[in-house]
Amino acid sequence: MPIAPSSAHKPQLNAVLTHFNDLIVPLWQGPGWNAELALPYEALDADHRPLPPQRYRAMACARQLYVFASLIGEPGKAFAQERAAALFRSLQRHFHDAEHGGWFYSI
């Protein structure tokens, strides 16, 4: 995700991006992913295990779709295109209201 920050904020931005790339993205790829439904879990506990699902939200799926699509072509992120495609299919499969148009907020 190329961003052109002001030099005053660059250290903070770099810290956030490092945290995101080194912790958050791997969690979303591993324990934060429900492979059976091909959907992201809403939350993980302190030990990085999924909390029992109460629901799955379209926005959580769309957020991760955006993130993984943004990582396509980045060095070391060869997984991004496959995950973005899976999330796009899941968004359409689970949340699109084909009968009335639009989208379901959650399932």
What is the meaning of each model-derived region?
Residues 1-107:
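Glycan-recognition and catalytic cores of secretory/periplasmic carbohydrate-active enzymes
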